[in-house]
């Protein structure tokens, strides 16, 4: 069903219903205008907006410049009936295009449902419409009626391309941000759109981005509709809350104030400019405003000015605000419902998300100050369709977004070149002491009268330099921790899957009816929306500098197109002072070739050689092994843009190696993270439960603190670093285009010197030349993008994250002391729990929380680069064993030869997992290239691998050290060996002096983190310092090795159990790496994090969790109990029963029994999963095994209370009961493998995580939404954390 009621024509006669002359609220009397009601609550007025504000009634250009990148004025636009008809059809077509997507249908339904609150009465027990949320509709007989509405689309005012969402009403700013909302007016035109450079973002396809692209006008209208949604629901951010820029330097934009509302509406990583502390402030503010509205509805006893009933209007606002209603009719705000509505309005509805649904190209940031504007006509289907936009299917316009490419689809786009009233703000950058004879003209920004060379730089081409005032820093505030301290739920990233979940649960029914309203005054007088005062900055401000800038270098590459000959030069001075010279950063050989005149007979060969050389110059890259996280360097960026202000441009590669990515930044960001605020722990005398809960809450709040700091750093990085990198990206594209233009001009000049007869013998096409040069530029931009992205991520990871981690580690140390003292002070209350709680505190606070960029941004380009950053650590590996293409191979650049014995076993699920037995034929030999055989006294090196060591079962293993990895020759080298409860690293020099570093673990422990479980081992060796062993990213032991002499290792590495007395012994090993450097702690943690494969769920041992495999269950909150079934059927329940009991062999091991209780089997919900591996967010069923028969885990979601008791049901009896579980992998990177199971109802709504709740001292399994509110990353304390235990030979327990 279409969104627009019917097809309208502007000349259709008025009927007083959906075609009528109307009066809208304004600041004075107005003449009625013809309007069209395209849907309930939504009208379109195909007129220029000269009536909402009399001060804006003049359509001519203003006398002074506006502080915007570009303005366009044409007083004749939209003055004829044909133009108005085309406008009407264009707007309705865009509404249908938006409505055709799932996201658009949700947004438009929200807008129709978003009736402004009836708060127009001065009596608090009375509901009354606010008159400025109404229009007067003129009837055919001349009378009028008043009608409430939500949205009006109006033509633009004087500036045709200034699209905006505005409103009128009493104290209008409060209405749009106090929860009430007010009627919205959008100034918009479907006949104009904006350009952007997509090649700045393209990473892989040189065919994409061959020119300028045009924005789909549906995206532009959707952006304004999102604003309307915020304002109708009264959650718009105060326009005074803006993102400011500094203005004190020549390279910074002046006067730019981007409102938080715009950043939030755009979405993507721009929304991350608003730091989390401020976003939490907004959310809490509007939550309280919604509670005020619920309170007002509860007080209301009557309604006036309408024939609608009070109860009907209450129900309208109940639907709008998703209020809860109890049996007495009292309304309240449910926090979960509010959070869902607020998330939908502010994070689901964004421009960035609409781009994904429209499947179009779009600007990548709101801070896109491209000045290209195009005239378009979207009404004909041959130009634009509802489903495809410009990229028409079954045509050449469908591929590579060619329909939006303004050069390929040039018939659809008319670029506005001669702007009426094109105002630009600029700065004048002058370098002192330059002799200016024969300089370029003053019109180009050069001062001929002074001994200063001045260039004019547009304000919007300068660096975006955010002010420190933008970043809230309340991290130093202390906090009181109690037993009921609120733990914030971890935020869920916005994904297409999440949006689809919102769509599936969205209620599209119950669209509000038209309500009869008593006639208001014939002229509804509104109050103008006051806009914030933007500080104005002087235009043309002059800055006197003593050196050239990036902008001088770019200007030196420009020239005036004409009939005169130009020539390239490698001298910036010469190019700036001589109008016929153009600066190039290409080689002197290229300069000689391009400047050399050629005869006609040689012309085509000359051109072909120049194109080849141009491609060769732009393709230049350098590589270095000195920087692990930057794999390629574009050496000409320095001389192209004067990076480093001339100091480093002649050796840009050397400067980057010496200084790092910081040399790219014009201004170095400062991150002011104070000493983090401490926690004040509240004591509870003689109350064990509340005391333990307080400790748990402190640890969870600690995790929140890490999250806050990481978010704060990412916000600073995006705003302060990434924006600078993006400007360099843009300027490099301009620089390459300048070189192409100069090359073309020289070639074209030479061609025009020939006689007509000579030209006739030359088959030369300037357009073909342009295409070839543009293709070279776009290929070059792929490398430039990769390099700049790597630099940006490198700066984040090496200069910003470590600073935050140091602050957090200091905080952890302080909290650890406070918690241990708290436990000691309350030891009398915590009888039987003291040691367990001390261990929990020590373990939790001695482990850093790894940084994961994907938690904080969803920009795929940056996330891809972050992943590459992690992989680049592997690139320093000189041996990297992986199983690929049915072979075990060395992925390092050395490709070492590998020999595999006949008794080596590769796990069938993950073939990187290699099993070695205590057999002569169970071995792997790696033959190293001579270049990497270790033979040194000083060179550092490291190794890392994962290992799973089965339990030692008998006394034959005591005091039996045996080698598993050996690189010794002539009693010199290194090896890894095992002993009962030990992993041992040995270094030995040629004089047989040795050093050992050991990790020890115990087998006399209830539940071990190490026995038969995958362990990540890293050993680093600094030859002038220590050898260190890390387990799961944590430093365990270190010993000095500076006393060792030359170590000459073997040229092969043998993986084999050598010297083991137990003939049944075996080990598992995977991901072996050898590095020719000492890995630092951050690199070890990054490597650990990457190799943990957090997107795949793991079982108790660390293997991949699988479908259709039986598992015993371990609850991490109460690990001494197991799951049992009271009875099957809907009246039965499952519960935790204990204790587990023990398995033991005297003096060898003493452990809890793991194979106890009811087994769970994970079953596929859909057939899309092909490899039988359970992944994060998989939707599954859980079967439970009772007396060798499988039953389905399910619940009745209509049970009273938050906790829904789970039952084991016959599978055919499940029916409509809730049984779908979403599997969650906790990305804690710890030595345990926590899983969480989120049960959902049949509509996809969360019922809650599966845990347990005490009912009459019985710990029954439940699905509880309490967990969803309380859960926090890395928590080991909540009852919804589980581990799946399969039977495994390495544990040695007989299953019951």
From Swiss-Prot:
GO (cellular component) term, any one: host cell cytosol
Question: Per its UniProt entry, what is the enzyme's top EC class, as one word?
Answer: hydrolase
| Protein keywords | Cell wall, Disulfide bond, Host cell membrane, Host cytoplasm, Host cytoplasmic vesicle, Host membrane, Host synapse, Hydrolase, Lipid-binding, Membrane, Metal-binding, Metalloprotease, Neurotoxin, Pharmaceutical, Protease, Secreted, Toxin, Transmembrane, Transmembrane helix, Ubl conjugation, Virulence, Zinc
Q: Per the entry, what modulates this protein's activity?
A: Toxin internalization is inhibited by azide or dinitrophenol or at 4 degrees Celsius. Dynamin (DNM) inhibitors abolish toxin uptake.
Question: What effect on the protein does mutating residue 1171 to A have, as reported in its record?
Answer: Decreased binding of NTNHA by RBD at pH 7.5
InterPro entries for this protein: Bot/tetX_LC, Clostridium_toxin_transloc, ConA-like_dom_sf, Kunitz_inhibitor_STI-like_sf, Toxin_rcpt-bd_C, Toxin_rcpt-bd_N, Toxin_trans
Per the UniProt entry, the effect of residue 366 to A is: Light chain has 40% cleavage activity on SNAP25, 30% decrease in Zn(2+)
Fill in the PTM field for this protein. Answer: In a bacterial culture the precursor chain is initally cleaved on the amino side of Gly-445 and is processed more slowly between Lys-448 and Ala-449 to give the final mature heavy chain sequence.
Summarize where a ganglioside GT1b (d18:1(4E)) binds, as residue positions: 1117, 1203
Protein name as catalogued: Botulinum neurotoxin type A
Which source organism does the UniProt entry give?
Answer: Clostridium botulinum
Q: In the record, what lineage is assigned to the organism producing the protein?
A: Bacteria, Bacillati, Bacillota, Clostridia, Eubacteriales
């Amino acid at each position: 069903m279409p969104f627009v009621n019917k097809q309208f024509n502007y000349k259709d006669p008025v009927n007083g219903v959906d075609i009528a002359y109307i009066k809208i609220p304004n600041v004075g009397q107005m003449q009625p205008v013809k309007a069209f009601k395209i849907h309930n609550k939504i009208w379109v007025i195909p007129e220029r907006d000269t009536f909402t504000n009399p001060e804006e009634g003049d359509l001519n250009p203003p006398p002074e410049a506006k502080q915007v990148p570009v303005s366009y004025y044409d007083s004749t636009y939209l003055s004829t009936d044909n133009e108005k008809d085309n406008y009407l059809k264009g707007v309705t077509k865009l509404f249908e295009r938006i409505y055709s997507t799932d996201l658009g249908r949700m947004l438009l339904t929200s807008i129709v449902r978003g009736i402004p609150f009836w708060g127009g009465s001065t009596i608090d027990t009375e509901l009354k419409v606010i008159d400025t949320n109404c229009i007067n509709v003129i009837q055919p007989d001349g009378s009028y009626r008043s009608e409430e509405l939500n949205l009006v689309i109006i033509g633009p005012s004087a500036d045709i391309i200034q699209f905006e969402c505005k409103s009128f009403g009493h104290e209008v700013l409060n209405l749009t941000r106090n929860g009430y909302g007010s009627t919205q007016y959008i100034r918009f035109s479907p006949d104009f759109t904006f350009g952007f450079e997509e090649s700045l973002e393209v990473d892989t396809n040189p065919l994409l981005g061959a020119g300028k692209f045009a924005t789909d006008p549906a995206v532009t209208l959707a952006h304004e509709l999102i604003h309307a949604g915020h304002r109708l629901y009264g959650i718009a951010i105060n326009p005074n809350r803006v993102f400011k820029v500094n203005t004190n330097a020549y390279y910074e934009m002046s006067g730019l104030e981007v409102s938080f509302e715009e950043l939030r509406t755009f979405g993507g990583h721009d929304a991350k400019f608003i730091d989390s502390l401020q976003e939490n402030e907004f959310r809490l503010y509007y939550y309280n405003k919604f509670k005020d509205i619920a309170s007002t509805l509860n007080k209301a006893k009557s309604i006036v000015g309408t024939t609608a009933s009070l109860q009907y209007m209450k129900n309208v606002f109940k639907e709008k605000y998703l209020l809860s209603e109890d049996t007495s009719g009292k309304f309240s705000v449910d926090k979960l419902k509010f959070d869902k509505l607020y998330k939908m309005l502010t994070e689901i509805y964004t421009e960035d998300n609409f781009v994904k649904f429209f499947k179009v190209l779009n600007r990548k940031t709101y801070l896109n100050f491209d000045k290209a504007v195009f005239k378009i006509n979207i009404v004909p289907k041959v130009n634009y369709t509802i489903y495809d936009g410009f990229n028409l299917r079954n045509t050449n316009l469908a591929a590579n977004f060619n329909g939006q490419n303004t050069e390929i689809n040039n018939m659809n786009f008319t670029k506005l070149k001669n702007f009426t009233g094109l105002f630009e703000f600029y700065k004048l950058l002058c370098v002192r002491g330059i002799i200016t004879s024969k300089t370029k003209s003053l019109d180009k920004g050069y001062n001929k009268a002074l001994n200063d060379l001045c260039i004019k730089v547009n304000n919007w081409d300068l660096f975006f330099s955010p002010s420190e005032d933008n970043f809230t820093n309340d991290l130093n505030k202390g906090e009181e921790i109690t037993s009921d301290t609120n733990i914030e739920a971890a935020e869920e990233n916005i994904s297409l899957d999440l949006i689809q979940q919102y769509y599936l649960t969205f209620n599209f029914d119950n669209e509000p009816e038209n309500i009869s309203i008593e006639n208001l005054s014939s002229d509804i007088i509104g109050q103008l929306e006051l806009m914030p005062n933007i500080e104005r900055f002087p235009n043309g401000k002059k800055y006197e500098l003593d050196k050239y800038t990036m902008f001088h270098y770019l200007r030196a590459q420009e020239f005036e197109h004409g009939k005169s000959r130009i020539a390239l030069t490698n001298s910036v001075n010469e190019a700036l002072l001589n109008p016929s010279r153009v600066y190039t950063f290409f080689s002197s050989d290229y300069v000689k070739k391009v400047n050399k005149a050629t005869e006609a007979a040689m012309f085509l060969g000359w051109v072909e050689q120049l194109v080849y050389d141009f491609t060769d110059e732009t393709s230049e890259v350098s590589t270095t092994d000195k920087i692990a996280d930057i794999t390629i360097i574009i050496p000409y960026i320095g001389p192209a843009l004067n990076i480093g202000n001339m100091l480093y441009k002649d050796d840009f590669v050397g400067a980057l190696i010496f200084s790092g990515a910081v040399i790219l930044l014009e201004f170095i960001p400062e991150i002011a993270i104070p000493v983090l605020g401490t926690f004040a722990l509240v004591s509870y005398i003689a109350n064990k439960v509340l005391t333990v809960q307080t400790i748990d809450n402190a640890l969870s709040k600690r995790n929140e603190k890490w999250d806050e700091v990481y978010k704060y750093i990412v916000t600073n990085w995006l705003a302060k670093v990434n924006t600078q990198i993006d400007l360099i990206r843009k300027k490099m594209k301009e620089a390459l285009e300048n070189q192409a233009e100069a090359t073309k001009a020289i070639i074209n000049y030479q061609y025009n010197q020939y006689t007509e007869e000579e030209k006739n013998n030359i088959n030369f096409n300037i357009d073909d030349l342009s295409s070839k040069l543009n293709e070279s530029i776009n290929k070059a931009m792929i490398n430039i993008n990769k390099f700049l992205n790597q630099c940006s991520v490198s700066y984040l990871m090496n200069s910003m994250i470590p600073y935050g981690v140091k602050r957090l580690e200091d905080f952890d140390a302080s909290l650890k002391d406070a918690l241990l003292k708290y436990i000691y002070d309350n030891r009398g209350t915590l009888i039987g729990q003291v040691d367990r709680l001390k261990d929990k505190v020590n373990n939790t606070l001695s482990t850093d929380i790894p940084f994961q960029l994907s938690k904080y941004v969803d920009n795929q380009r940056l996330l891809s680069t972050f992943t590459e950053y992690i992989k680049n650590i592997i690139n320093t590996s000189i041996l990297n064993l992986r199983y690929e293409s049915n072979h075990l191979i060395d992925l390092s650049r050395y490709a070492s030869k590998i020999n595999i014995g006949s008794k080596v076993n590769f796990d069938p699920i993950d073939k990187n997992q290699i099993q070695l037995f205590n057999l002569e034929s169970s071995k792997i030999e790696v033959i190293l290239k001579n270049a990497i055989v270790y033979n040194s006294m000083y060179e550092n090196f490291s190794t890392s691998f994962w290992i799973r060591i089965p339990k030692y079962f008998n006394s034959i293993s005591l005091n039996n050290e045996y080698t598993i990895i050996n690189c010794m020759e002539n009693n010199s080298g290194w090896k890894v060996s095992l002993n009962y409860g030990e992993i041992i690293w040995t270094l030995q020099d040629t004089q047989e002096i040795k050093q050992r570093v050991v990790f020890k673990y115990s087998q006399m422990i209830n539940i071990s983190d190490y026995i038969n479980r995958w362990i990540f081992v890293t050993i680093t060796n600094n030859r002038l310092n220590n050898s260190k062993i890390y387990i799961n990213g944590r430093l365990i032991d270190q010993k000095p090795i500076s006393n060792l002499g030359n170590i000459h290792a073997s040229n092969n590495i043998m993986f084999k159990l050598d010297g083991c007395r137990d003939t049944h012994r075996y080990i598992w090993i995977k991901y072996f790496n050898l590095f020719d450097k000492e890995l630092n702690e951050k690199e070890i943690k990054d490597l650990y994090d990457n190799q943990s494969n957090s997107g795949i769920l793991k079982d108790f041992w660390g293997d991949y969790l699988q479908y259709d495999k039986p598992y015993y269950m371990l609850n991490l909150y109460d690990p001494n109990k197991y799951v049992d079934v009271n009875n099957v059927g809907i009246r039965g329940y499952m519960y935790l029963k204990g204790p587990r009991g023990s398995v033991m062999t005297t003096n060898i091991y003493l452990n809890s029994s793991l194979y106890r209780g009811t087994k769970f089997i994970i079953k596929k919900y859909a057939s899309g999963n092909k490899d039988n591996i359970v992944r994060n967010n998989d939707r599954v069923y859980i079967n439970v095994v009772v007396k060798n028969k499988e039953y389905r885990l399910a619940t009745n979601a209509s049970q009273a209370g938050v906790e829904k008791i789970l039952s084991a049901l016959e599978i055919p009896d499940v029916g409509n009961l809730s049984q779908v579980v979403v599997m969650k992998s906790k990305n804690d990177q710890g030595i345990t493998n926590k899983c969480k199971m989120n049960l959902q109802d049949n509509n996809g709504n969360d019922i809650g995580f599966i845990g347990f709740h005490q009912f009459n001292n019985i710990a029954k399994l439940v699905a509880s939404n309490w967990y969803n509110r309380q859960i926090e990353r890395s928590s080991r304390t909540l009852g919804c954390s589980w581990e799946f235990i399969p039977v495994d030979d390495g544990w040695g327990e007989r299953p019951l």
